C-alpha cells in the first residue's frame, strides 16, 4: 500500500490488519490515533482537514475517518469492533504522560512527522506545530521544499521529522 492509495484501499488495509488480531465472538472497543490535522466534532468523530507527510490518498479530506474505518470493517464482515474514540497522537502522548504526572503541559511527537499539543487552562490544544513556517531557510532547505508535494507548508516538519531528513540530506 503506498501513499497514493484510495481512501477505501487505506481503510480496507487497516481493517484487514485489525481482522488479523481479533477473535470472532468477542466485542472490542477501539480507541485509535490519527496523526494528521483533523477537526474533532465528537470523541469518535474526526474529519481530516488535509494530508501531510506527502500523503496523497484521495477521497479522505473532509471525511470522518472513523466512519471510513467502520465502513471498511463492515465490508470485511467485522461487526464486533466498535470505534469509541479517535485522538491525535500528540494529545495521546500528552495524556499518557499526564496520567502519572499532573504537571505535564506539553505532549510532543518527532517521528515520521512533527507536532505538539499543550495544555491551556483545562483544554488540550493540538498545535499542528509541524506547519510552523516562519523559520529561516538556507538554500538547501528552499531547494528541498520545492521538491515536496506542498511547498511552503509544513516547513518545521520538513526540516525536523524522520519522513524528510533522509531526502534533505540526499538533495544536499
What do these predicted regions represent?
Residues 11-27:
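Short amphipathic alpha-helices and their capping/turn segments at secondary-structure boundaries
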Residues 1, 20, 30, 40, ...:
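Gly/Thr-rich phosphate-binding beta-strand-loop-beta motif of the actin/hexokinase/Hsp70
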Amino acid at each position: 500500500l503506498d501513499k497514493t492509495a484510495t481512501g477505501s484501499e487505506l481503510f480496507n488495509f487497516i481493517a484487514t490488519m485489525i481482522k488479523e488480531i481479533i477473535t470472532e465472538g468477542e466485542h472490542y472497543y477501539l480507541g485509535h490515533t490519527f496523526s494528521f490535522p483533523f477537526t474533532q466534532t465528537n470523541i469518535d468523530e474526526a474529519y481530516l482537514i488535509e494530508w501531510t507527510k506527502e500523503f496523497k490518498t484521495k477521497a479522505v479530506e473532509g471525511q470522518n475517518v472513523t466512519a471510513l474505518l467502520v465502513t471498511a470493517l463492515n465490508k470485511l464482515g467485522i461487526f464486533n469492533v466498535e470505534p469509541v474514540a479517535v485522538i491525535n497522537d500528540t494529545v495521546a502522548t500528552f495524556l499518557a504522560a499526564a496520567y502519572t504526572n499532573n504537571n505535564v503541559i506539553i505532549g510532543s511527537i518527532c517521528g515520521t512527522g512533527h507536532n505538539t499539543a499543550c495544555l491551556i487552562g483545562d483544554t488540550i490544544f493540538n498545535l499542528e506545530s509541524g506547519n510552523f513556517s516562519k523559520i529561516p531557510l538556507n538554500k538547501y532547505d528552499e531547494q528541498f521544499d520545492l521538491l515536496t508535494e506542498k511547498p511552503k507548508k509544513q516547513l518545521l516538519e520538513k526540516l525536523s521529522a524522520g519522513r524528510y531528513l533522509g531526502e534533505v540530506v540526499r538533495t544536499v
